[in-house]
Design a protein with these regions (language model features):
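A short glycine-rich, His/Asp/Glu-containing loop-to-beta-strand
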Residues: 80-119, 125
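Short beta-strand His + acidic residue motifs that chelate non-heme Fe in jelly-roll/DSBH
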Residues: 94, 118-120, 138-139, 166-169, ...
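Short histidine-centered beta-strand/loop micro-motifs
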Residues: 95-97, 117-123, 130, 149, ...
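Active-site lining segments that contact anionic ligands and/or coordinate catalytic metals
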Residues: 103, 116, 125-126, 135, ...
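Glycine- and acidic-residue-biased ligand/ion/polar-headgroup-sensing regions
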Residues: 124-146
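Short acidic-glycine-tyrosine-enriched beta hairpin
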Residues: 144-172
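Double-stranded beta-helix
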Residues: 146-153, 178-208
Length: 208
């Protein structure tokens, strides 16, 4: 496509079904063989992706990546933006942004001033928190007790949007995030290694 836009398109002719050197037709040097059913299925997934939040297979050279780029090019101006569905309560909001079957999901968390969220742990799920606006205290504590029967120590990180650092929520560690501001909302990008499944939330309450 880039070559065609630059006036450097690939050209060929045909003898029957065999492609030969020529000037009659433009062609794409990379081709994929897919059934009509496969193409229709992928186009349906692309169409629904704004609702499902799913990101298709974007592996280098994959047919899905090529078709996805072509699909997007057909959006008309004025249709590039779409709404998301925030889960809102008196603490703030939590909005899923992107979901992938193999690389988890990305969400945006907003916490009102002074609010603490979390105080739970996961068996297999792990997360990365990145504060992009505001200042937060993120605390983690290993679940269980040490050899003397005492709780494990709390590990605390104070992070802010002015000095971005990612903090990992490790499986088996209860964790919380607190907005340290009295006036400003805290905005955090949260990545989890697996999409949220309401049938198997893997979330267990325990105060840090």
């Amino acid at each position: 496509m880039l070559g065609a836009l630059l006036g450097e398109e690939h050209r060929c002719g045909y003898e029957g079904l065999e492609r030969v050197e020529g000037e009659d037709f433009c062609y794409v040097p990379q081709t994929d063989v897919k059934s009509l059913g496969e193409i229709v299925y992928l186009l349906g997934c692309f169409r629904d992706s704004r609702e499902t939040l799913s990101v298709p297979d974007l592996a280098e050279g994959s047919f899905s990546k090529k078709l996805w780029s072509t699909f997007l090019s057909y959006y008309e101006p004025g249709h590039f933006a779409y709404g998301l569905k925030p889960n809102v309560d008196d603490r703030g909001s939590f909005t899923e942004f992107l979901r992938t079957p193999e690389r988890g999901q990305v969400s945006i968390n907003v916490s009102k001033p002074g609010i603490t969220k979390g105080n739970h742990w996961h068996m297999s799920k792990w997360e990365r928190f990145l504060v992009v606006s505001g200042t937060a205290s993120i605390k983690l504590r290993k679940v269980g007790e040490d050899a003397e029967g005492n709780q494990f120590p709390v590990d605390e990180y104070v992070v802010s949007g002015s000095d971005m650092r990612a903090v990992e929520m490790i499986p088996g560690y209860t964790h919380s995030i607190t907005n340290l501001s009295d006036t400003e909302d805290l905005v955090t990008v949260m990545w989890a290694n697996e999409p949220f499944d309401p049938e198997n939330p893997d979330t267990y309450y325990e105060e840090v």
